């Protein structure tokens, strides 16, 4: 296991440097923050996972919940390293058992995510993980679902925060503490 101190830069700067910006994708005016270069580097992935593990090792968690789809990349690895369970929060229609659903607003329309109704029990301590926080809608929906099941949502966590889009302020305003590794200005 590599320690974050083995990274060539400050761990946060190292992670930030591995995130590619793709202008005008998926539409003009959007600066897409692409985490695939980060994931392709074993060293960068190890540093990233270690940052999350070091943050939550003493948090007495029961689960790490991952948001569909890119939250599924990091969340199970962190859950494994912490020896806790993983809870998927999926786009609607992807879970085979009885579910609870939560819809949230998009720029043009709505989306819905769901969780198995037996994914956790009252009092379970959970951290929600995603790749980035933009408008905050998906993470807020995940928080609402977990709380509906009686879980204690300890924190929301993401690799990237896009604070100019207002999601992190929205989530904090709703009482959800947040941890993000790095942030980028703009859209």
Swiss-Prot record:
It catalyses: AMP + diphosphate = 5-phospho-alpha-D-ribose 1-diphosphate + adenine. Pathway: Purine metabolism; AMP biosynthesis via salvage pathway; AMP from adenine: step 1/1. One of its GO terms (cellular component) is cytoplasm. Its EC number is 2.4.2.7. It holds the Pfam family Pribosyltran. GO terms for molecular function: adenine binding; adenine phosphoribosyltransferase activity; AMP binding. It is found in: Cytoplasm. Homodimer. Catalyzes a salvage reaction resulting in the formation of AMP, that is energically less costly than de novo synthesis. HAMAP family: Aden_phosphoribosyltr. NCBIfam families: apt (TIGR01090), PRK02304.1-3 (NF002634), PRK02304.1-5 (NF002636). This is Adenine phosphoribosyltransferase. It comes from Burkholderia pseudomallei (strain K96243). The lineage of its organism: Bacteria, Pseudomonadati, Pseudomonadota, Betaproteobacteria, Burkholderiales.
């Amino acid at each position: 296991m590599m320690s974050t101190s083995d990274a060539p830069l400050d761990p946060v700067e190292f992670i930030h440097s591995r995130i590619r910006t793709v202008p005008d994708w998926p539409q003009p005016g959007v600066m897409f923050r692409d985490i695939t270069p980060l994931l392709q580097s074993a060293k960068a992935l190890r540093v990233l996972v270690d940052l999350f593990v070091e943050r939550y090792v003493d948090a007495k968690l029961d689960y790490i919940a991952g948001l569909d789809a890119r939250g599924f990349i990091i969340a199970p690895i962190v859950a494994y390293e912490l020896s806790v369970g993983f809870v998927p929060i999926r786009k609607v229609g992807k879970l085979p058992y009885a579910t609870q659903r939560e819809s949230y607003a998009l720029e043009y329309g709505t989306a819905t995510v769901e969780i198995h109704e037996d994914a956790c029990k009252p009092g379970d301590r959970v951290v929600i993980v995603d790749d980035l926080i933009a408008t905050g809608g998906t993470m807020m929906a995940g928080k609402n679902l977990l709380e509906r099941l009686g879980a204690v949502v300890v924190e929301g966590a993401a690799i990237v925060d896009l604070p100019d889009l207002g999601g992190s302020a929205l989530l904090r305003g709703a009482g959800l503490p947040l941890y993000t590794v790095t942030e980028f200005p703009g859209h």
